[in-house]
Amino acid sequence: MSGLASKAKSRVKSSKGKNSTNIHADELNEDVGVVVRVMTAVVDVKFASGKIPKILNALESKEIYNGKKLVLEVSQHISDSIVRCIALDGTDGLSRNDKFIDTGAPISVPVGRGTLGRVFDVLGNTIDECGPLEESSYFIKQIYSEIPKLTDQKIATEILVTGIKVIDLLAPYLKGGKVGLFGGAGVGKTVLIMELIHNIAKAHKGVSVFAGVGERTREGNDLYHEMIESGVINLENKDQSQAVLVYGQMNEPPGARLRVALSALTMAEYFRDAENQDVLFFVDNIFRFTQSGSEISALLGRIPSAVGYQPTLAAEMGAMQERITSTNSGSITSVQAIYVPADDLTDPAPATSFAHLDSTTVLSRQISELGIYPAVDPLDSTSQALSADVVGKEHYDVAKEVQRILQTYKSLQDIIAILGMDELSEEDKLIVARARKIQRFLSQPFHVAEVFTGAPGKFVSLEDTVLSFKGLVEGKYDHLPEAAFYMVGSIDDVIKKAELLQKEGKV
């Protein structure tokens, strides 16, 4: 339960001794307003003159709509008596003169140990049909909070091992850092984020919080069951669960999709600040957060900015992203899937996210068309952690040599397409052969895709990854066929696959 109802009731009871249930549209008091205009997801509410609610306050309906009370969030003051609000649920059935109560505070959600193993909506209501939360197991906290002071923040220098070769080698993640998974439609963002949840959250000793922002309901359901199967959520004993899920899916109004990331982040901040934990914060998808803000902005009457986005895009993104940080109390490591419209990384939505991230993992349609998954572009993906001071000299040197070989291969592709391989020098032929093996070795079978591929998932340690690629760039495996490097884990798997291919006479 969100706690909005109880706050509203207590305020209404204490307001000048009046019984607010008998108030008509022309007898407004400071707590009760009436609807004067409805524009789908935006609603205008009139209060007594000079007694309007503060910006960001939550208003709760007195009537029931679609089986529950409707909550609005104050966004603008239109006059000294009218506020323009964002609806956080569907407005079907809402009409003029319907009454709303000012709760006197912003949206609040439950935080604490009692939230573990549960699924919530944007308002903090449980939606997993496992009953209400135990009263003693949670606290209520507003979804808006101050950004931690610079003196309280901590710099991340420790590598977070994901078990995914291409990420650990070329764009490593920092523990306590922010990571963006960029990609167009259908290149594997959600599968990659689910594999990261499987690999990291399962081995992670702290708490994981997942925010489903405007994505498919089916994927949210799949993730919930995946977490149950992997033991991250324990239905029998919720206290042993390690994850909280907060969903505002595609079918929900833009107001819910705009605020659900903040609701989830509030829960993550509690575990960081009050319980001194290292928290994993997954968001799928940040673009939907931006998109919902654009929908709301148009309805609020703001003049659109570049490519039709809201003029407040940078401010909204910054207000959320700057709260995702590590402090002296604990850390929040954030992994965010970011949809790239029309595969254009210069689009304002993904471009605004870049400035806030420590690591960027770019998924490429060209690589996915080659059948290489995860379709991570090893040349476009970046990480602040890829320096000799953080990852060590050996790792850094191997990663840079891998990138050099791949870059050389990329520059030779036009010549190969026009003149063929025979026109290349012997040195270039060797580079091309190694690059093709590296390209295939960067593929990897995922645990979460086992049901589709039939191939068991592989987790590769950082040490194995560095040693395997070191041998590859030094030419130790030049004698092995290309096919042996495709969809395997460590170099030992490559050698076994090469022997198997030889026995079957396929090489």
UniProtKB/Swiss-Prot annotation:
It is a peripheral membrane protein. ATP binds at residues 183-190. Its EC number is 7.1.2.2. It is an enzyme of class 7 (translocase). Keywords: ATP synthesis, ATP-binding, Cell inner membrane, Cell membrane, CF(1), Hydrogen ion transport, Ion transport, Membrane, Nucleotide-binding, Translocase, Transport. Its main location: membrane. Pfam families: ATP-synt_ab (PF00006), ATP-synt_ab_N (PF02874), ATP-synt_VA_C (PF22919). GO terms for molecular function: ATP binding; ATP hydrolysis activity; proton-transporting ATP synthase activity, rotational mechanism. GO terms for cellular component: plasma membrane; proton-transporting ATP synthase complex. It catalyses: ATP + H2O + 4 H(+)(in) = ADP + phosphate + 5 H(+)(out). It is found in: Cell inner membrane. Residues 1-22 are annotated as: Disordered. Produces ATP from ADP in the presence of a proton gradient across the membrane. The catalytic sites are hosted primarily by the beta subunits. Belongs to the ATPase alpha/beta chains family. NCBIfam families: atpD (TIGR01039). F-type ATPases have 2 components, CF(1) - the catalytic core - and CF(0) - the membrane proton channel. CF(1) has five subunits: alpha(3), beta(3), gamma(1), delta(1), epsilon(1). CF(0) has three main subunits: a(1), b(2) and c(9-12). The alpha and beta chains form an alternating ring which encloses part of the gamma chain. CF(1) is attached to CF(0) by a central stalk formed by the gamma and epsilon chains, while a peripheral stalk is formed by the delta and b chains. This is ATP synthase subunit beta. It comes from Ehrlichia chaffeensis (strain ATCC CRL-10679 / Arkansas).
